[in-house]
Amino acid sequence: MSVLSSRTGRDRQRYDNNFRLVSGCIPYRLMKADETEEDSGVDFVNKLEVLMVSSPNRHDLVFPKGGWEDDETVLEAASREAIEEAGVKGILRELPLGVWEFRSKSSTVEDECLGGCKGYMFALKVTEELEDWPERKNRERRWLTVKEALELCRYEWMQRALEEFLRVMEDERRLRTEEETVHDSSKLEEESQIDPWYCFVVN
């Protein structure tokens, strides 16, 4: 039996210009590379996995998300949904991947009259997977490659969020690689005892 419980009802639901505000995340992990493998861009994408969960009473897959309530920040809401729906904890990036307007297939008549939903999505680096979580009986979780997730993702707006997630992750990897190259070059210069007056960096 789960110690935690999911929030229910919409008494504390936030709205913005008739849009129901939703917060969610893309939980991810990076599989460890084989020491003999080169760290190419293709290898990086293949090692990147995202966690999806099934919808209640259906077999389609989605990312954890739910209503953003008035007693929590948008980041707290995303973290809460990750625990409630997927049973994962981790490091949530403060900068959202984006904000998407959509109409949920499970929307109530009230939502349809108001104007649908506005979803904030974040990237969550998973550090812990819980064996038991609030919605374990109603949801299955699956680790997938980004390519698999794009094919199985039910909603178009979530596909766009996943594409943005991949772009951000690839940009960060590229930046890290460039920084490591600069660091290695600097170390080599020091070991070669090159006069620093003859060294310069082009930005």
From Swiss-Prot:
It is an enzyme of class 3 (hydrolase). It comes from the Eukaryota. One of its GO terms (cellular component) is mitochondrion. Residues 18-166 form the Nudix hydrolase domain. Keywords: Hydrolase, Magnesium, Manganese, Metal-binding, Mitochondrion, Transit peptide. It is found in: Mitochondrion. Its cofactor is Mg(2+); Mn(2+). The keyword Hydrolase applies. Belongs to the Nudix hydrolase family. Probably mediates the hydrolysis of some nucleoside diphosphate derivatives. This is Nudix hydrolase 12, mitochondrial. It comes from Arabidopsis thaliana (Mouse-ear cress). The lineage of its organism: Eukaryota, Viridiplantae, Streptophyta, Embryophyta, Tracheophyta.
